[in-house]
Amino acid sequence: MHPLAFLEVYMIRVMVNGAGGKMGREVVKAVHNDPELTLVGGIDPTKAGQDVGSVAGIEQLGITMNASIDEVLGTNKPDVIVDFTNPAVIYENAKKMLSAGIHVVIGTTGLTAEQRDELDAIGRQN
């Protein structure tokens, strides 16, 4: 076994939702620069089809920006999605991601206590 093959197996696969926004672009850069993480995609309906790295202001990464969570769930399932979208969509998106067994890091404010409790329960079930 190649010595780096072991590392690739255990790298955390990360996708960024809201990857075209200010915070999302910073998360893309941070994930790209972390040797323990591998960036597998970005989601932003206004930047769909563009290279995730180019949108973030770094080199092209050969990773195409997706338009929606639904596109991702059927293709390139990450281990974790970091979400920097907005309160209008975060709750439904987080329910979809957690129900699909994807860990979620939410950087968006605006969830009610009841919504946070429900997301916690869904995450614990999956």
What are these regions (language model features)?
Residues 20, 24-28:
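N-terminal Rossmann NAD(P)H-binding glycine-rich loop of SDR-like oxidoreductase domains
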Residues 95-100, 107-126:
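Rossmann-fold NAD(P)-binding glycine/threonine-rich loop
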Residues 39, 104-105:
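Hydrophobic beta-strand scaffold residues
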Residues 14-18:
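Conserved N-terminal Rossmann-fold NAD(P)-binding element of oxidoreductases
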Residues 64-68:
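Short acidic-hydrophobic, aromatic-tinged amphipathic segments that line or gate anion-handling sites
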Residues 70-71, 76-97, 110-114:
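Beta-loop-alpha module in the N-terminal Rossmann-like domain of NAD(P)-dependent dehydrogenases
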Residues 1-10:
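Short, Lys/Arg-enriched N-terminal segments with co-localized hydrophobic residues
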Residues 33-58:
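NAD(P)-binding Rossmann-fold cofactor-contacting core
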